[in-house]
Amino acid sequence: MNEQTIVAGTSRREMLKRSGMGVVAGAAVGALATPSVQAAAADIKISYASWIHGHSMQIEYPDRIASMRRAGFSIDVEGKPGTTNWFHFAIPTPVIIDDVRLRADKVLLRFTTGSVDAFVRHVHVYDGEKLIAEHNNVNLSKENPLAGFVVPDRPLILLGLGISIGVAFGVEMMDHHMDFIAAGCDFTLRNPL
């Protein structure tokens, strides 16, 4: 009798494969998804995704911050009322995989703010010192479980990818906290459309 042992650290995917349920689950999802969803899923060709945790975020103007706390789950920043600031994430960047240079497809942010008076104004994306994407006046606040920003023309990445987030803290008697949980980038081999 051939006995399979499931060890600590085995992922759910591995457990499903071992039990044969992966095929059943895949078939069920395929049967339930509409043709347009299936077509969109087939079009997604992300070669690599890289994320960095929120507690690694760098603050450009620390003197404009009332308080800051790094924790295992996020960085919590309280801005001084009536100020703006820039927060920066250095994304671990694989520029070449298997002799092929990657392209930036989209950057993603996971964050929350305490109120509409603490908000993300701008999202800029850099390859080294070169600005490759600029999303201004996005004005996002409250819950943002996965805010995505396309990098136009999917440029080849030559150096390292950085995400700079322009934020603002208003003057209303409202909560001026922001929690950044993570930031990342989807990389692709696809040429621009």
Give the ranges of each region predicted by the language model.
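N-terminal secretory signal peptides
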Residues: 1-14, 25-28, 37-38
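C-terminal segment of N-terminal export signals and the immediately downstream linker at the start
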Residues: 30-57
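Short beta-strands within extracellular/lumenal beta-sheet-rich domains
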Residues: 78-100
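A short beta-strand element within beta-rich, extracytoplasmic domains
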Residues: 100-114
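Short, surface-exposed beta-strand/strand-loop-strand elements in extracellular ectodomains
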Residues: 118-129
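Extracellular carbohydrate recognition and processing domains
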Residues: 132-154
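Noncatalytic modules at the cell exterior or secretory-pathway interfaces
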Residues: 153-174
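Exposed low-complexity, polar/acidic, P/S/T/G-rich flexible segments that act as propeptides
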Residues: 168-193
